[in-house]
Amino acid sequence: MMEKRRPVVCILGPTGAGKTATSLGMARKFPVRVINFDSRQVYTDFPVITAQPSPEERAVCPHELYGFLPTTETINASGFVDLAKERIDAAEAGELPVLVGGTGMYLQSLISGLAPIPDIPDEIRERIRKRSEEEGGPALYAELEKVDPEYCKRTHPNNRQRNARALEVYEATGKPFSWWHNREVPPSPYNFLKIGIKVDLDELTPLLKLRIEKMLEAGAVEEARKAWENCPDENAPGWTGIGCIELMRYIKGEIDLDETIRLWAKNTRAYAKRQLTWFKREKDIHWFAPHEYDKAVTFVGQWLAD
């Protein structure tokens, strides 16, 4: 007889859609353990700017993988999958793991699985890192197009971290990153239910602007100043996120506060648009409007009962 797989709920959607509120609605109905899958909310120095759950929200139920990474470090999809599996498996019997976030690559990697990639030698990592700093993201992307055009369809010329990782794997193994991704992987030990928060981009846009205003009121500028004192390196992974980049430029005197807010809102909207495009391609998502907490909770309850 096939062993019953552990149920795991995934709450996904674009930034600012109301994923945290939905997860807390579930936590008031079921014993829930919330696990982050947002690539920006992992950073210790940016709880306000990356909209991590507040202390009051975290008091409702256990929250995992928020604010644990220094600004100088990064985590790739493989590293996230390992940490997420640890947290899922550590959940107590009867406790429902609920993944919350908007980084589609992380979620896809957890659900679909990743083929095991050999460890990359430190000298290769360091060589690629130096090239990234000296030559810039577009130069790495141009090289990646020659050796792994398939993977280039899923990344962007300015995404230095992902492109550097792909080149590291190719240089270390002699095989494209996409080859490793396409390898057959063992079936997942988890039974996933994907709950999507459905919003229209035009409807979301004014909410994103309001969200930025609230972040500024909550001390986003002061948070960025303190982070810059601790890590005055604009190439550090933690500074590459939206909001962090714009506030860093403001702190350095490159732009005024009005321009900071304008760029922050513009870039957040563009990111939300990319997220919506990603999730539209995902299969088996059950969509609910932001205000439909009760419907989503009821649906999860029925799914668990089945």
Curated annotation (Swiss-Prot):
Keywords: ATP-binding, Magnesium, Nucleotide-binding, Transferase, tRNA processing
Binding site for substrate: 15-20
Biological processes annotated in GO: tRNA modification
GO molecular function, one term: ATP binding
EC number per UniProt: 2.5.1.75
Superkingdom assignment: Bacteria
Keyword tRNA processing attributed: yes
Positions of ATP binding: 13-20
Signal sequence interval, chain numbering: none
SUPFAM superfamilies: P-loop containing nucleoside triphosphate hydrolases (SSF52540)
Essential cofactor(s): Mg(2+)
Name of one Pfam family that matches: IPPT
Annotated site (Interaction with substrate tRNA): 103, 125
Catalytic activity: adenosine(37) in tRNA + dimethylallyl diphosphate = N(6)-dimethylallyladenosine(37) in tRNA + diphosphate
Interaction with substrate tRNA: annotated segments: 38-41, 161-165
UniProt KW DNA-binding keyword: no
Self-association and partners: Monomer.
Family per record: Belongs to the IPP transferase family.
Function text: Catalyzes the transfer of a dimethylallyl group onto the adenine at position 37 in tRNAs that read codons beginning with uridine, leading to the formation of N6-(dimethylallyl)adenosine (i(6)A).
Protein name: tRNA dimethylallyltransferase
Natural source organism: Maridesulfovibrio salexigens (strain ATCC 14822 / DSM 2638 / NCIMB 8403 / VKM B-1763)
Gene responsible for this protein: miaA
